[in-house]
Amino acid sequence: MGNQQSQPEFVLRAPTEFSEKFVRHLQESTETDTSRYMDMENYIQKRVQDELKQLQLRQKKAIDAIQEEEWKSNAKTIKDSQGSLDSNLLSAEFRSFQEKLEKQSSINDKELKIKLKEVESIRSDLLKCMSEHPDKSLICHPLAEKFAILASKLHNPKVGSV
C-alpha cells in the first residue's frame, strides 16, 4: 500500500523538433540586431515627425477657427453699429486680435516644445537601454510603456486627462 504513489507521475509530452520550414526561415533570415535597431529608430523618427505634422495642422485649424469667430463677431459689431466704427477703432481691434493670436500660439508652442523634449528624453533613454541590453528587452519594458504613453498623449491630448 505505501509503495505505490496515489497519482501517476506527470510527464510532459511536447515535440522537441521544429519544422523544417521554421528552421530554414531562421537560417535564411538576414535581419540582425543592428537592422532591427535601425528599423526601430526610423520608425520612431517617422512617428515623431507625423505627430509634429498633426499638431501643426491642429494648431492651424484652431487659429483658423478663432479668426473665423473674430471675423463673425466683428461683422456683427459692424452691422450693429451701422458703420459708426472709424479706422482707429478698427486698427485697435485688429491689434488686440493679433495679440490674442500670438499669445495663444506662443502658449501652444511652449507646451508642444515641453512635450517634445520629454518624448525625446524618454526615447533616448529607451534606445540607450535597448543598446545596453540587446538580449534582455524586458528590462526596457517600463521605458517602452512610458514612451508609448507620451507618444499617444502627443497624438491625442485627451488620453492623459481621463
UniProtKB/Swiss-Prot annotation:
Protein's membrane topology: Peripheral membrane protein
UniProt subcellular location: Mitochondrion inner membrane
Entry keyword annotation includes Membrane: yes
Pfam families membership: DUF1690
Source organism, top-level taxon: Eukaryota
Keyword Membrane: yes
InterPro entries the UniProt entry points to: DUF1690 (IPR012471)
GO cellular component: MICOS complex; mitochondrial crista junction
Keywords: Membrane, Mitochondrion, Mitochondrion inner membrane
BP GO terms, sorted: cristae formation
Function (record text): Component of the MICOS complex, a large protein complex of the mitochondrial inner membrane that plays crucial roles in the maintenance of crista junctions, inner membrane architecture, and formation of contact sites to the outer membrane.
Family membership noted in the UniProt record: Belongs to the MICOS complex subunit Mic19 family.
Subunit-structure text: Component of the mitochondrial contact site and cristae organizing system (MICOS) complex.
Protein name as catalogued: MICOS complex subunit mic19
